[in-house]
Amino acid sequence: MKLSGSYQINLEKQKVWESLNDSETLRKSIPGCESFTKKSDTEFTATATNKIGPFNASFTGDIQLKEINAPNSYIIEGSGNSPVGFASGKAKVKLEDAEEGTKLSYDVEANVGGKIAQIGSRLIDMTAKKMADVFFKKFSDLISSKNITIENENNASSMTKNNKILNNK
């Protein structure tokens, strides 16, 4: 499965980068995340439970950050196991300065196997896209509110995906 997208986040690139490397922000942003533990600056373990088709899948796995080019890009690789199957994948995450903040783009390659793979690629693709949208909405909301708290800036924030406003407070 391949998935890609881009998001506009109305914060400067350095703040977005720092948040992408903050384990607590990631834990709160990942759909269904029950735990997210930092093992080193580039290694984490995580457990997340999500409904995928008829399965309530709880995955536990390892995550590594590679090819780090701060504050511009990295590759995040992970693999996890569940009683209903396994998943593995990697995502190239890239940050670029944009007119109103930062453009975050990603390209994901993922594989699933076991019982969960039997539900079909279309349902898996739809679920993955939905989870990516939920992640980036939560991520944007969290880092925007952190920015407001720290810098006492105007609380108007927005995140756009391909020019479609997803959140506008």
Model-predicted segments: where are they?
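Hydrophobic pocket/interface hotspot
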Residues: V16-L20, L26, L65, Y106, ...
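A conserved amphipathic terminal alpha-helix motif
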Residues: K115-N154
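Intrinsic-disorder/low-complexity, polar/charged segments enriched in Ser/Thr/Lys/Arg/Asp/Glu/Gln
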Residues: K2-S6, E43, S58-T60, S73, ...
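Hydrophobic/aromatic beta-strand elements that line small-molecule binding cavities or substrate pockets
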Residues: G5, E34, G61-E67, G89-D97
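A generic beta-sheet turn/junction motif
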Residues: I9, N50-P54, N69, S82-V84, ...
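Beta-strand/loop substructures that line and gate deep hydrophobic ligand-binding cavities in soluble
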Residues: G80-M126
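Glycine-rich portal/gate segments that line the openings of hydrophobic small-molecule binding cavities
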Residues: T37-S79
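Hydrophobic ligand-binding cavity/cleft-lining segments
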Residues: M1-T47, S157-K169
